[in-house]
Amino acid sequence: MHQDQLFVQTVKRKKHSSYAGEISPAVPNLVNRDFYAEKPNRLWLTDVTEFHIPAGKIYLSSIIDCFDGLPVTWTNVTSPNANLVNTMLDHAIEILTDQDHPIIHSDRVCHYRWPGWIEQKEKAGLTHSMSKKGCSPDNSACEGFFGRMKNESFYNRSWA
């Protein structure tokens, strides 16, 4: 076929991407993987994780304080909607004093870019920091917390 200059024409397929673009302007990464805090309520990390149980899925959203690595607050629901992170943020804001204005660091998922969440955060005087797109090490302390929690409390257990 090559001698007769016959070639197979192939169509190059594009990779599928669910990325639909930015839904709001991204804020800078103020943390830069430095997860150290001298005092409580200086640097918070937040993320959402899911648990698969026999009845379906449960979504857990929490705020972790970098001072001691413990959760400040958390919420869980069966549907990952705005109420999940808004309720969690409400609970966290309730424990702050007038002198506390922590940086709250998150990844770039839509939960932390909804106008309601942004407005709530700004009213409380919180400074937002975001990871780079698709860069999980930028929020590794929070991801690590979820990993330890699942290993110690969830995996290898029967929930039926």
What positions do the PLM features span?
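Charged DNA-binding/catalytic regions of mobile-element recombinases
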Residues: 1-160
